[in-house]
Amino acid sequence: MILGIGTDLANIDRMEKTLARFGERFRNRVFTPLEQAKAERRADVAGTYAKRWAAKEACSKALGTGLRMGIAWKDMSVANLETGQPVMRLTGWAAERLASMTPPGHEAVVHVSLTDDHPWAQAFVVIEARPRAAPPA
């Protein structure tokens, strides 16, 4: 069953200006070290950060909170599987909120899709509850 859906659109040019103006202070407040390392290795640094910003916004909406109620930017982190598929990793209050939304006997799965077409970066997040597999008899 679907527990939450969120989407967000971020302007890459605005992200580039924000990075230039606030630099490390902004990066350290919003992005995890893993996200920063990924972005700084990319040719399109601002685009990579903008997609991750949009993913955090979309995830907070899917959690039903937006960026309030104690949720921190770094409680939501975008990583990539070896295949390149993006995944959301939740910690802190975001993980607590996810656990509180998940019905008994289910596990939560957070799906994320990222895309960009300059000057826009977009993220879409779906939180799904799947029934837990019954233990073998």
From Swiss-Prot:
It comes from Cereibacter sphaeroides (strain ATCC 17023 / DSM 158 / JCM 6121 / CCUG 31486 / LMG 2827 / NBRC 12203 / NCIMB 8253 / ATH 2.4.1.). One of its GO terms (biological process) is fatty acid biosynthetic process. Its EC number is 2.7.8.7. Keywords: Cytoplasm, Fatty acid biosynthesis, Fatty acid metabolism, Lipid biosynthesis, Lipid metabolism, Magnesium, Metal-binding, Transferase. Its cofactor is Mg(2+). This is Holo-[acyl-carrier-protein] synthase. Belongs to the P-Pant transferase superfamily. AcpS family. It catalyses: apo-[ACP] + CoA = holo-[ACP] + adenosine 3',5'-bisphosphate + H(+). Transfers the 4'-phosphopantetheine moiety from coenzyme A to a Ser of acyl-carrier-protein. The keyword Lipid metabolism applies. It comes from the Bacteria. The gene is acpS.
